[in-house]
Amino acid sequence: GTPLSGHEVAQGYKDIKERSAVVRFKVKDEDAYILAWTTTPWTLPSNVALCVNPDETYVKVKTADGYTYYLAEALCDKILGGDKPPAPYEVVERYTGKELGGTGAEPFFDCAVDICAKQHKKGYYVVCDTYVTLTDGTGVVHIAPAFGEDDAKVGRKYDLPFVQLVDGKGNMTAETPYAGVFVKKADPMVLKDLDEKGLLFDAPKFEHSYPTCWR
């Protein structure tokens, strides 16, 4: 499989409001979750890693509802919604993104795990790259090397598994729970499944440029 290139989809971009998602990736061997943000929930079944900015500050926080989360310090108030003092979370520890590198995360979907195993490549851990910004989201992005240039670049840098769970027509493949469903139609289905598993933190509406036709 090859990643879709930027210029291949550059025609026909327009701004549309759609659901983005802040999802909870369970940390391996710890009762805590890494909060990651995505504007393309349909890519989550193809996820193989999480990426942080090595130079930014990240925190482990405990929230009022008893959850422990990792995310960028600068985005805590925005994501955790502490409008009025006292903020509904406490900072337990601070880290640089680099220090979080290597932290293991549990996969959401079994379909990608089998593919990774066949490729004999390590996935499901935190990697670092300066392309991650703190302008939106949580300061943590999920990586699916089959989709998007940045993901592909990070995938090559860390020799991550390549999981392509979308066919040439833009439909989800048979390995996923959404076989034959067009990617954008799969978004709400993915979010619903994650919500039922308790892994969806939030699904705000988000406006961004998106290619409006597939090939």
Residue ranges with predicted function:
Residues G1-P45, G104, T130-Y131, T135-R215:
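Residue patterns forming the tRNA-binding/recognition surfaces of aminoacyl-tRNA synthetases
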Residues S46-V48, V52, E56-G168:
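Catalytic alpha/beta core of large soluble enzyme barrels
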